[in-house]
Amino acid sequence: MDHKIDLLQPALEAALAGKIQALVRDRGELTLTVTAADYLAVCTTLRDHAELKLEQLIDLCGLDYSSYKDGAGSPYTEGPRYCVVLHLLSVSKNWRLRLKVFCADDGLPVVPSVNEIWAAANWFEREAFDLYGIVFEGHADLRRILTDYGFIGHPFRKDFPTTGHVEMRYDAEQRRVIYQPVTIEPREITPRIIREDNYGGLH
C-alpha cells in the first residue's frame, strides 16, 4: 500500500496547495488536516479532482480531545477541543485518506455539513451531533439519532457524568416509563491490579 501513498501524497499537495494545515504519514496511512473554513472546498476537491477521486465516505465521527490537555508531549494539549474525522475511499484508484477538521469554537462546535458531497454523511453527522454536540451547518435534518428527544447533554463528551443526569424506570401506578433524578451517587473508581504467580500460564 506504500506505493499508493507515494502517489496520493504529492497529488494531495498539488490539488490542495495552500489549504493543507497538516499532512501526516504514519503506519502506512495518510491523515490530512484542514481548517473549518476550507473544509467544504477541500471535500469537493477530494471527491471530484481527477487525480484524487475519493468518491466514497466510509465513516465520519466526532472526537473530544479535552483529556489530552492533561497529557505530556501530546500534539493535542493546546488548541481546539472538538474534531470531526472522515475516512474516505477511492474505489477507482484503490486508496484511502483520513481527513480531520477541528471546530473553531469549543463553546459551540460547528463545521459545515458534507451531506451534499457524500450522501452517506447524513446519519453519521446526526450521530456526531447527538453524542458530541457538534453542529453540522447546512444539514437538512440535524436531530438526535441514538438518544431520546428529551435527553440532556451529549454522552460522549469527556465531561459528561458516567451516571448521566436522569434515570428511567417503569411506574406501575402511572403505567408508563418516567424520568427521575439519578439515584446512584458519584464515586471515584480506582482500578486495582492483582498479580498472581503463574497467572495465565506465564512464569
Swiss-Prot record:
Signal peptide: none annotated. Its EC number is 7.1.1.-. GO terms for molecular function: NADH dehydrogenase (ubiquinone) activity; NADH:ubiquinone reductase (non-electrogenic) activity; quinone binding. It catalyses: a quinone + NADH + 5 H(+)(in) = a quinol + NAD(+) + 4 H(+)(out). InterPro entries: NADH_DH_suC, NADH_quin_OxRdtase_su_C/D-like, NADH_UbQ_OxRdtase_30kDa_su, NADH_UbQ_OxRdtase_CS. SUPFAM superfamilies: Nqo5-like. It holds the Pfam family Complex1_30kDa. Its main location: membrane. Keywords: Cell inner membrane, Cell membrane, Membrane, NAD, Quinone, Translocase, Transport, Ubiquinone. One of its GO terms (cellular component) is plasma membrane. It is a peripheral membrane protein. NDH-1 shuttles electrons from NADH, via FMN and iron-sulfur (Fe-S) centers, to quinones in the respiratory chain. The immediate electron acceptor for the enzyme in this species is believed to be ubiquinone. Couples the redox reaction to proton translocation (for every two electrons transferred, four hydrogen ions are translocated across the cytoplasmic membrane), and thus conserves the redox energy in a proton gradient. NDH-1 is composed of 14 different subunits. Subunits NuoB, C, D, E, F, and G constitute the peripheral sector of the complex. Belongs to the complex I 30 kDa subunit family. HAMAP family: NDH1_NuoC. This is NADH-quinone oxidoreductase subunit C. The gene is nuoC.
